[in-house]
Every structure is written in structure tokens, then in C-alpha cells.
UniProtKB/Swiss-Prot annotation:
Cofactor(s) the protein requires to work: FAD
Record-listed NAD(+) binding positions: 279-293
PROSITE patterns: GIDA_1, GIDA_2
Residues in the signal sequence: none
Location within or outside the cell: Cytoplasm
Keyword Flavoprotein applies: yes
Protein residues bound to FAD: G14, A15, G16, H17, A18, G19
UniProt protein name: tRNA uridine 5-carboxymethylaminomethyl modification enzyme MnmG
Role description: NAD-binding protein involved in the addition of a carboxymethylaminomethyl (cmnm) group at the wobble position (U34) of certain tRNAs, forming tRNA-cmnm(5)s(2)U34.
One GO BP annotation of this record: tRNA wobble uridine modification
tRNA processing among keywords: yes
GO CC annotation: cytosol
Organism for this UniProt entry: Desulfitobacterium hafniense (strain Y51)
Amino acid sequence: MEYLAGNYDVIVVGAGHAGCEAALAAARMGGRTLLITLSLDNIAHMDCNPSLGGPAKGHLVREIDALGGQMGITADETSLQVRMLNTGKGPAVHALRIQSDKQAYHLHMRNAILGQENLVLHQALVERIKTEDGKVSGVVTRTGAFYAAPNVILTSGTYLRGRIIIGDAMYEGGPNGQQTAMNLSGALKELGLELGRFKTGTPPRIHRRSVDYTKFTVQPGDSVPWRYSFMPTQSMFWGRDVDKQIPCWLGYTTPETHQIIQDNIHRAPLYSGKIEGIGPRYCPSIEDKVVRFADRPTHQIFLEPEGWNSDELYVAGLSTSMPEEIQYDIIHSIPGLEKAELLRPGYAIEYDYVKPYQLSLSLEVRRIPGLFTAGQLNGTSGYEEAAAQGLLAGINAALRVQGKEPFIVRRSEGYLGVLIDDLVNKGVKEPYRLLTSRAEYRLILRQDNADLRLTPRGREVGLVKDERWAAFQKKKAAIAEINALWRGTTFSPLNEHLAEVLAGVHSAPVHGGISGEELMRRPEITINEIKQLIPQLAEYDEEALLEAGIEIKYAGYIEKQLAEIERFAKMEERMIPEEIVYDQIKGLSTEGRQRLKEVAPANMGQATRITGVTPADISVLLVYLEQKRRGGQIHAT
């Protein structure tokens, strides 16, 4: 028997990384928000690796923070170790990776939710989405509670018809022994949504006392306390000093390891037919790596701590769904793990996902106004991709409450824009992972300038509050002062200190007056050299110095990418009417017509990026729209 349990502006179903960001964003923008979770004890739980970031993923976390999201703040506060990756390459691919304390991360995020105004938290299992006149009207739980709301955000992760697989053992369930939502998939199908089936997996966890660390190579954190959040007051390491970071450890599998896997490959669910879902290309299981790369005698593994007070080590690189007894043999064949105690076996999990071509760029389901989906439910992998989608969905649900236009991030504005654009226009055939190679404008979309790109937009929608805005304005002013300082400082060729600094980095001597800006353009000159020559620069924040230096050193390349963005923007401005009937357009290819109907692109720029739509289809569409415009059947754009 149903009963009305409450009225809200926004309901978020699922309190993983997507759900937390969605609920916090909607509430912070003034929407009366309800967050429903299967378990209050698993909010923002890291079901797989205890880390955040890396290439593209770290960029996303900074973009989430720049917009006023929570993930970066929580990651910084609960960090175990920080490392800046790819420092030997250009700034476009520099990426922060933070090792997190799983339990502390969960507690910090839960406290943020419990302390948030306009946000109510409740434990329940949602079984149905209710609609009225084709629009969302609320959700119904297993106990019959009806929560009414015109906006519902589904962030159910890997919990839709979840099935755990360990060798021959298979059972219904969510990650780490949690319950799963078995009926919600059917309810979504009744609403007309097309679902698919994916799988992912996780490695075993072992006891830290059972490892012989002398057979591993230590991987310490950086001495610089890098952080995700642009807030200068953000604390790190749960209040500890930077020299208290916990290391990770590098090791390798052996030919013996690979032989054990090959001898038992017939028992691997991935190869025995027990797993039907498609797994992630960029995070293969160890059995998959052994089969696909049979010529390689070893593979890297990393032992990653799961918390300051946890005895568990996450064995990165050893994801597996092999039978439990075989997992013991695999682990004990690795040098240093001969006596390892297995605390949790690795497993695979299959789950349903919503095919994302059914969404608009706001993450609203096009056919069901008020219904949004975000996170792994949309066919992605990774905490960061999930959180970014949740943030966007939360913003757009709140804007819908306010009767405002959707918030769309373009590909040229952020990795968040690349992520959403790829999902909607290209679809997914395997769990989607964001990569720097997917972005056309990598030099523009650096992690260091995420705030310059997106914080003003977060301010416009009401998510960036006064304290963050003041910090942003201070950084912008500092960058302007730094630029003025080294542009206005000129050095004589007779300056002995200049000659010493240049000789120290094997830079050519100068034969005439030279400015600090001109010096900075030299590849071998870094901020450190400029600070030696212009002592006043020591007064400025390192982030502001870094940003100003990159903009000068790479000015030519940045200008070229900005010109490309401007040219492409003209295609984005050519709008496609919502009422267009693609079946009436002669000359479209069969696949192109089908994909255009499925995605319903809002503009020509989006149409060009749809998988299956050819350049010939674009030409036909442009001619058709121009004919209609000249005939007065559509408005000029």
C-alpha cells in the first residue's frame, strides 16, 4: 500500500560518488532535495581502488572543484599520499593522483551531506519511478513510501540487477556484499528506456602484515602537498604533515603466476561463458592480460593502502574473478606475497546500464522530462567520471526547478564536456573511461586552469559561493600582477646574475636587453630561474605562478587552439529545430538517419560528432536546413 512520504524538488536515488555530488549541488542551489541510499553505512564508498585521479580523471576532479563540487575537498582532506604524474611531459597531461583513506572519505562525505541545508538523507530501496502525463512525479520504495518530486536523478551505479561472480560461484548482490536493486531495471524498461549489460571487477585485498616488503619497490608520495581543491585553506592528510604520507609498493607477477592462470583458464568466468556483460578495455583482469599479452613474462602490480588505520592492501593490477582457491595460488606466486593472507577475494560484477544515447547533454532523459541519469548507470567506469556526471545532473535538476535553461559544458570548456558529449553522441560499447586523448583541446583543458575555465560558470548558476569566488578573484589578480611584473622587468646583457642563472641551465647568453617574459619563453627556463632573477615573484602563490608561466611559454600553441575553438563554435551555433523529421530528408544514409533520430542533436556541431553519421550525411542535412530556412519554414540561425 502506497503512502505519501514527502514532497521535494529533487530526489536523488543512490549515494555513491555521482549521487553525493548530485544531491549536494541541487541542495546548494536551493532545491529541497532528498537523497535515498540502500545503506547509510556505504555513502561514497570506494568499492574498488582507494585512489582518485590520474590523467584525465584528475582533470575531472579539479573541474568538479572549480564548479563548486565536493569530491576534491573530500579527497584532499582524507588523502594518504599525493603524486603528480607525467611531470616529464607537457602541462596538458600533468595529472594529480591521490591515495585516499576509504573509511575517512566515506565519513567526510557523509558529514558534508548530513550538514547540508535543504538536503534530507534516507535509507530505502527504490523500486519504481512514477510518472504523470509523461513527466516524472516521484519514486516508490519497497515499503510503499511515495516521495513526490518533479525531478529524479538516478545514480544507481552497479546495483541494477547486480550479479557477483567468483569462479563457479554466482549470486545476486552489489559490491562488497551489499544488496542490489533487482526490480528497478524492469521499471525503467516499462518507461521505455533501453538497457544494456556491462561487467567490471576488483582485485583481492590482503593483510599488510603478511607482506615481505623487501621484495617490492617503495613508491613514496611527493614532497609537495599537491591538492585538488582550489580553496587555499583546504587541509590535507586528515590533519597530518606531508612527510607522514603512506607509501605504495611496486611488484611484479612471474611466469609461474601466468602458468597458474593458463592452467586454470577454463575455470575463469570470463572465458567459460559465465560472464555475459562487456568489461572495461582499460582495466582488464589479470587473466585477460595473461591471455592477450602471452609474450610478456611479467605484469606490474601495486600494493595500495586502504587507510591510515586499515590492515587491508589493495592489489592493483590483479583484478580477477578466478575461483577463490586459484586466487590464493596466484597471490602466493608473486615475490613478497608468498605468505600473504587473503582478506577479501577478487570478483566480477555484472550490472544493467542505461544506453546514454537516450539522454540530452544535460543528462535528462529526452523522452521523460524530469528524469536524469548519472554515473556508472550511464555506462561509464570510475569514481571521477561518476561524480562529474552527478554534479552536472544535480545542477540541471536545480535549474529545472528554477525554470532556467540547462547547464551545458562544451568540449572546449572542460573534460566534463568531452565526457558527456562522447556518451550522448558516440554511445558506449564497453565501460567508458575518460582519457586525455579523447580531448581535442588538451592544452586549453589543463588541470591547473580548471578554475579559470569553469568557476565563473559555477558562480552564474549559484553553486560557487562567496569564499570560493573571493579566492578565485584573488588568483586572477595575482596572475595579472605576475604578468605585469615580468613583462615590465628588463635585464641588461651585462647583468652578471643573469649570466650565472642562464649558464646554470645551459641557456644561451643574451646580447641585448631582454624582459622576464622573453626569458620565460625559453624552453629550459622555469619558474625557479625567473624567481631567482625577480625576487618579488616569491610573494605569489605557486599556482598563480604556474598558470602565468604556462600561458606565456605555450602562448603560440594556445592561440592556435583558441582559433580552432572559435571556428568550430560556428557549427555549434547552427541550431537544428526540435521538430525536424529525419525520415523526410532524402539522401541520408540508413545508419545516419537512425542515429540522428536516436540522439536528436541540438546543433550541427553535435551532429558531426555522432557515431554513424558520415560527412555526406552532414552535407545533406546542411542543404536541407538551408532549403527550409529560405522557404521560411524554419528560423535563420
